[in-house]
């Protein structure tokens, strides 16, 4: 099914028994996380806390959690019937990234039709008025504490805005970038924008600071957009395609957007809540000077307002280190009447990002096959923090093939530049079955010959196990059968029962009393 907005999606989930309304009072401080975590681990429904308590008082709006807490709900949000159907989404993205030469006139017309749908028919539709601007808070009315922002873990430095869809545009870009970056409230109208340097929003900001130094950088943050737009922001969309366009392809209709009240950025017209504002130059009267704790490194000299972010409990299952990030000053907050605050938590897998990773794994396979057609299957186990460990099965064709695949995976998509461990197995091994993977590792690997170690490679700065922040090692494990040139020994032959015997036993099975 396709969904016009978040409320349309929630209505469908409720009809399917996939949404639970909770009327008992529940605090946004810790209690909501504990409930959501228990329900997610049990494969339970999305949760709508209708009697949320925030800062020891009733919240002004309900809180939605665990929206994408199962792979099936992720698939539904992307317009698919089940997780397996997301392979088709991956095929579409692969074609948009690198179209193959047409095989004939009919195929050429089909490819032209697809590109037309992606690049023109699904360009966002701008509307003059929108539900997301029915209510406007400006000036002294801007107070972030009025939003029921969760405090997720006991050691968190502050509440954490975790599902904000951050919308930016670089100075030379025609398309807007949508990304999801966590944000730490600093006061009534300020949030720390934690984005990593390779992410789209950070790149847009870098380009703006270089092209227009000393000028405020406009940003909007949408909360509670329709599911296709939310999921488009976490999918590896080609740089030539807007996430709004991709959301339109998923939905089957153009994404409706409206111009922000204070900038030229376009926001999802049906979003529940929108924050508008800027990253301010450090010398702007509204900017606050950075406070450097004793013993801490000073902020980088960006020329913009910066603050020390964290610590927060993260998707790794640990509290992360503090680091400096730019500060987002909120000029106004717009929202629908009776808005819903969309929230989540991150913690030791499984959490909601880990579930998203399981579902999006199906999208990655066709993208990877376009670059490495020998790939049979690819798996990012959620317990590996969704991206730090990958298992890939291949149709091995020559000695050294597994090593080529390792380095290819580290290079093909930005999403895998932080993958620390890659295990390569043959096509007879199911990479999603640990019993088979471990069997292959223990019978087809020599620890010295078949281990590839790479030093001084890019690593997620949240990875405190690396010797230097942002830089560390990688390991590739070749658990494939070895070819001549890789070994001089006679290689083992796997044991298989005769098929005729298996059929005879199948026929007599019911008579055996087993």
From Swiss-Prot:
Top-tier EC class: lyase
EC number: 4.1.1.98
Subcellular localization(s) per the UniProt record: Cell membrane
Residues binding Mn(2+): 177, 243
Disulphide bond pairs: none
Its membrane topology: Peripheral membrane protein
Record: active site: 314
Catalysis: reaction(s): a 4-hydroxy-3-(all-trans-polyprenyl)benzoate + H(+) = a 2-(all-trans-polyprenyl)phenol + CO2
Family: Belongs to the UbiD family.
HAMAP family: UbiD
Role of this protein: Catalyzes the decarboxylation of 3-octaprenyl-4-hydroxy benzoate to 2-octaprenylphenol, an intermediate step in ubiquinone biosynthesis.
Textual note on the cofactor: Binds 1 prenylated FMN per subunit.
Highest taxon, organism lineage: Bacteria
Record protein name field: 3-octaprenyl-4-hydroxybenzoate carboxy-lyase
Subunit text: Homohexamer.
């Amino acid at each position: 099914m396709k969904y016009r907005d978040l409320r349309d999606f929630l209505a469908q989930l409720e009809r399917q028994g996939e949404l639970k309304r909770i009327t008992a009072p529940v605090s946004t401080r810790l209690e909501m996380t504990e409930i959501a975590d228990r329900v997610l681990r049990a494969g339970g429904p999305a949760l709508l806390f209708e009697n949320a308590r925030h800062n020891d008082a009733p919240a002004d709006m309900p809180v939605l959690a665990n929206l994408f807490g199962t792979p099936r709900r992720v698939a539904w949000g992307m317009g698919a019937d089940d997780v397996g159907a997301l392979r088709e989404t991956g095929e579409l993205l692969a074609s948009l990234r690198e179209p193959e030469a047409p095989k004939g006139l009919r195929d050429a017309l089909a490819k032209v039709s697809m590109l037309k749908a992606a690049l023109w028919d699904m360009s966002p539709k701008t509307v003059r008025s929108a539900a997301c601007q029915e209510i406007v808070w400006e000036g002294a009315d801007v107070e972030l504490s009025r939003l029921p922002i969760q405090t997720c873990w006991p050691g968190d430095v502050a509440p954490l805005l975790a599902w904000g869809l951050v919308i930016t545009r670089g100075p030379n870009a025609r398309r807007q970038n949508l990304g999801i970056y966590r944000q730490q409230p600093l006061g009534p109208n300020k949030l720390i924008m934690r984005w990593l340097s390779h992410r789209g929003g950070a790149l847009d900001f870098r380009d703006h600071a270089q092209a227009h130094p000393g000028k405020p950088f406009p940003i909007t943050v949408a909360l509670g957009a329709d599911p296709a737009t939310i999921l488009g922001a976490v999918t590896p969309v080609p740089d030539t395609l807007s996430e709004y366009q991709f959301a339109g392809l998923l939905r089957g209709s153009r994404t409706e957007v409206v111009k922000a009240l204070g900038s030229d950025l376009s926001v999802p017209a049906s979003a529940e809540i929108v924050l508008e504002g800027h990253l301010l130059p450090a010398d702007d009267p509204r900017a606050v000077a950075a406070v450097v704790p004793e013993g801490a490194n000073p902020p980088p000299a960006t020329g913009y307002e910066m603050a020390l972010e964290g610590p927060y409990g993260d998707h790794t299952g640990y509290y992360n280190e503090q680091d400096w990030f730019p500060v987002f000053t909120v000029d106004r907050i717009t929202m629908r009447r009776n808005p819903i605050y969309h929230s989540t938590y991150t913690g030791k897998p499984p959490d909601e990002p880990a579930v998203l990773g399981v579902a999006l794994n199906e999208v990655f396979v066709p993208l990877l096959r376009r670059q490495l057609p020998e790939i049979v299957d690819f798996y990012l186990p959620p317990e590996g923090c969704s991206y730090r460990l990958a298992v890939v099965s291949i149709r091995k064709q020559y000695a050294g093939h597994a090593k080529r695949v390792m380095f290819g995976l580290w290079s093909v998509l930005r999403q895998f530049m932080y993958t620390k461990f890659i295990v390569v197995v043959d096509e007879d091994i199911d990479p999603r079955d640990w019993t088979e993977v471990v069997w292959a590792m223990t019978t087809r690997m020599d620890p010295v010959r078949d281990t590839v170690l790479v030093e001084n490679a890019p690593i997620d700065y949240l990875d405190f196990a690396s010797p230097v922040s942002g830089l560390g090692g990688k390991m590739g494990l070749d658990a494939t059968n070895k070819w001549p040139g890789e070994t001089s020994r006679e290689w083992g032959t796997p044991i298989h029962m005769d098929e005729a015997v298996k059929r005879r036993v199948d026929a007599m099975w019911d008579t055996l009393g087993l």
